[in-house]
Amino acid sequence: MKKLKLITVVGTRPEIIRLSRVMAALDASEAIEHILVHTGQNYDYELNQIFFDDLGIRKPDYFLNAAGKTATETVGQILIKIDPFLEEVQPDAFLVLGDTNSCLCAIPAKKRQIPIFHMEAGNRCFDQRVPEETNRKIVDHISDVNLTYSDIAREYLLREGLPADRIIKTGSPMFEVLNHYLPNIKASNILSTLNLEKGKYFVVSSHREENINNPDNFNGLIESLNQIAEKYNYPIIVSTHPRTRNMIESKNVKVREEVQFLKP
């Protein structure tokens, strides 16, 4: 039996986490030749490789190394570098998830008439200033099959004119992800490692460009962290994206001792 040749594209750590069990199932299938591609749009060891290691996911088959100096340059590099790979591999199907720049790989796939499957389709925030809103709309409308997490997402796509036979509600793969890794989560010693008491700490993740690169928003974020620390006197663990760390270092930010900036 001829195997279906499927390319899956990832580029960010949330995609890697959410697709971890899907990719494992695709790898295990006797009916599928699964090819995993990493765009390399922010290929930093702490942000990506550690997730492949910790989640037990194999190394990608191909890296696009598409990182650019700007978001626009990165998108351009992704489109330019995926196309010759598609020409070489000649896949039967193409899978992307979500709304980051990596999902725009679907554009060259569409031009080559490769069937596109889009997971996490139909999500909308209705804020055109958000770059991901543009990405998700583009990919939703060029995909052959949109896999939604909810009835609401499905309804959004129907209202935008997509035919019902191109939309399948699957639910979120995070259910399988959490169930699979639950023993590891329960066995984790992270609380003792960080000297934290259960239920008496805060976890913060804030790395979006509009929050970090905007001086007023960034200063407001730091002020909020200090106020929360002062009010509750609990440790605040901040998962610190490189963009956030660069801003902290460049501004020589001062925070209360309860605030800890840790690697993601």
Language model features with spans:
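N-terminal subdomain of nucleotide-sugar transferases
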Residues: M1-Q41
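Cofactor-binding loop segments of dinucleotide-utilizing enzymes, especially the Rossmann-like FAD-
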Residues: G11-T12, T39-Q41, A121, S172, ...
